[in-house]
Regions:
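Short, Lys/Arg-rich flexible segments
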Residues: 1-81, 112-180
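Short, internal acidic amphipathic alpha-helical interface segments
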Residues: 79-125
């Protein structure tokens, strides 16, 4: 190592630890985030109403399909894991071909609602629960903060690589507020 002072020793330790953190984020933590998002989608999106205009794809190509919840950039870098949902609209599942939403980010349309900050609108206008925001990403973050499974996953990922760690702190969020 050759460190002559604490500052150099910490810099060396950081350099050794960063790739291990990124690896744990890209494997163990990513899987926990995907599972939590799929759960949140069921709670905040699918349980909100039953569609009449289209057939839901659910976890078979739809918003809750874990294959549509991906790591942006393919891996965590510099201690940051970015997870996005890339689900496309479902023109094949509509009951009326004149009323199909295409050419828009379906996750953002659902997350932020009709006529959101990007100007996305459903192509079929009517009143309904689907027009309102159904913030599944926010619910995912709140769930993870409360449960802490991502922290345990990080610890397990570091352990896999021979790094000992200890979890400290706790959540003070009320579970009753997670999905209501």
């Amino acid at each position: 190592m050759g460190a002559t002072n604490i500052k150099e020793a910490l810099a060396y330790a950081n350099k050794q630890l960063k790739p291990k953190i990124d690896s744990a984020l890209s494997r163990e933590v990513y899987q926990v985030v995907v599972d939590a998002e799929a759960f949140s989608i069921d709670e905040k999106v699918y349980d909100t109403y039953r569609p009449l205009m289209y057939k839901r794809r659910g976890d078979m190509g739809g918003l809750a399909d874990k294959g549509n919840i991906i790591m942006k950039g393919g891996k965590a870098t510099n201690g940051v894991l970015r997870v996005i949902n890339i689900t496309d609209p479902n023109p094949g599942g509509v009951l009326n071909r004149d009323r199909v939403t295409v050419g828009k980010s379906l996750p953002e349309l659902i997350e932020y609602g009709n006529n959101n900050r990007w100007g996305y609108k459903y192509d079929f206008q009517s009143k309904g629960a689907y027009m309102k925001p159904r913030p599944f990403t926010e619910a995912t973050v709140r769930y993870l903060r409360y449960v802490g499974s991502h922290v345990l996953a990080l610890q397990n990922g570091l352990k896999r690589q021979g790094v000992k760690s200890r979890i400290t702190g706790s959540s003070d969020e009320n579970l009753d507020d997670l999905f209501f």
